[in-house]
Amino acid sequence: MKISSGAINFSTIPNQVKKLITSIREHTKNGLTSKITSVKNTHTSLNEKFKTGKDSPIEFALPQKIKDFFQPKDKNTLNKTLITVKNIKDTNNAGKKNISAEDVSKMNAAFMRKHIANQTCDYNYRMTGAAPLPGGVSVSANNRPTVSEGRTPPVSPSLSLQATSSPSSPADWAKKLTDAVLRQKAGETLTAADRDFSNADFRNITFSKILPPSFMERDGDIIKGFNFSNSKFTYSDISHLHFDECRFTYSTLSDVVCSNTKFSNSDMNEVFLQYSITTQQQPSFIDTTLKNTLIRHKANLSGVILNEPDNSSPPSVSGGGNFIRLGDIWLQMPLLWTENAVDGFLNHEHNNGKSILMTIDSLPDKYSQEKVQAMEDLVKSLRGGRLTEACIRPVESSLVSVLAHPPYTQSALISEWLGPVQERFFAHQCQTYNDVPLPAPDTYYQQRILPVLLDSFDRNSAAMTTHSGLFNQVILHCMTGVDCTDGTRQKAAALYEQYLAHPAVSPHIHNGLFGNYDGSPDWTTRAADNFLLLSSQDSDTAMMLSTDTLLTMLNPTPDTAWDNFYLLRAGENVSTAQISPVELFRHDFPVFLAAFNQQATQRRFGELIDIILSTEEHGELNQQFLAATNQKHSTVKLIDDASVSRLATIFDPLLPEGKLSPAHYQHILSAYHLTDATPQKQAETLFCLSTAFARYSSSAIFGTEHDSPPALRGYAEALMQKAWELSPAIFPSSEQFTEWSDRFHGLHGAFTCTSVVADSMQRHARKYFPSVLSSILPLAWA
């Protein structure tokens, strides 16, 4: 171990220490080793001899002044000093063949100056709180009496014991830190001097370039017990590092990148901490103090230790600034509440969850008083800024997401100011989300926004029925959200009971269909029809549906069923067979319209209709065929002689000898972008088109129980025949193919109900190539 005798400024050392060092010098000049009798590293000798007053072997001929200085105050330190001297003696004896007596004397003197200064500093700091001595002598950042105990005597004294100067550049400081950290990583116990980086300059240093990757890994190596007091980290990058039991007092961390940096058990008092806007993930502070430290308004303080604030003045920053207290921490505020300041300081929904609101709220609940006081100061600042409603509007959601929750609801000042803000926020939610689905609620929304909406509906019960679309969505997400609390669910259930008792709602729930069939909701299963939406146009009309159905219709997939609900008029269930879903949603339940239309645009069956029935030649038929796809049942029938003849005129040219003509087949491939597709993919598409035309020919659309348009039946069978030619493997079996074919034509005594054929083919397609079916089959038929 290399020992450096850093220069000691004698003007600042207590007189007793000066005399002690002078005495040691004299003894080393005269050969200190000759006066050491026997030193044993025992636990009892020193304290026992002090108690009995007897002479101890450890109390050799050191001057009485040394004993007088240490005995009444820190006997343990004296013991370690004497042991160190013994180690020097032993080492010198081992190396005396190669080192002259004069050099030995110089080395002893240099080491004793350094060692006694360190021990004295350790004693002063622990006993009196005195500041570290100059010349590189310091103590551990956690103020614990561990510095001297961690010091290891030298193994092989070096001749280079002259004072070493501090690093002269950030690169040199970085090199020195790298060396110390790697030694610590290797298991070496560093002295306080080794870990002393006070007044260091790390400006513009990217620590990931000077330290091994293991220090940037999750649960990786830790920089532990270092003293960075009064150091400069401006424009440095300390991202992903973990500093434990470190001291940063009076340091400058201005524009420092500290993404995901962890500070634990550390002293960060009086620090200028303004980390860079390029910091992607907030640093964390675990059991760390930040007294009088200036913090940005976008910090996470969940692990900070707060103390009583002192009377210190706010910090001074370039350009000036306003500040509020959060316990003993300083939070920076904008000079003026401009539009940009409102967005930057208050809108965490627009700034990756970061705002001064979230910073204050990130403190644990044990600091509720400090949190409320800081929020009140913030509200006073906002009130003093005389902000208009238009200026506050973009941040209303952020404001209520924090201030409408405890402990801030306990403050009359905050509640009074927030009341109008929350009312405007609720009105905007009603206007926006009654007719469209709410965004998929994440953890933030479930825990911070849904409770506010419940509270707003509780205050304004009339909105439950006037904005039934929004209210049912709020209850739905409260009851199904995995991050909603039990308290939120209980309040939602209680509020829904009030809704069901409303005169506009109660007539629809006593029909043996609702909830648990007796007029009460059954929240134990998502299959129960617990939700009842009122028509936005007709108070006599309502929709009853289950939790699962409501969820899927608000956030549909290609397989979503759009008819799995009860349509009620005056409380009675009515058939939806001849009701167009798109018209029902547009007129009565617009909350589903956008989602339905979005799914409908992905269905491409209409392209084949446009190929066969061009609007120029067959405009009326084109409209009839497309309109029929918007409902499950059609009142238009095409089985009269004129209609049958007209359809034959259109379809017969496409089916020479009962098969698709090559030209028409190529038109189909082109329309569905299948020219270069595999035969199997072509076959799957033709199969699904056949299913749709089978539905056209059935009694549900253009046929009846006893008759159906032959042209449509023949065209459906031709599409299926071509699919079989391309890929028989997509069919259940050759027998099933033959059965379907016979049913289309009534051959071999087969039952000719094309409705049965359409249903059977549709079930097969949904099982084996559902994505193709979902891209073709009209939603109303799905």
From Swiss-Prot:
Maturation and modification: Ubiquitinated in the presence of host E1 ubiquitin-activating enzyme, E2 ubiquitin-conjugating enzyme and ubiquitin.
Residues covered by region (Disordered): 137-171
Protein name, UniProt field: E3 ubiquitin-protein ligase SopA
Keywords: Secreted, Transferase, Ubl conjugation, Ubl conjugation pathway, Virulence
Family indicated by similarity: Belongs to the SopA E3 ligase family.
Subunit structure: Interacts with SpaK/InvB.
Subcellular location: Secreted; Host cell
Residues at the catalytic site: 753
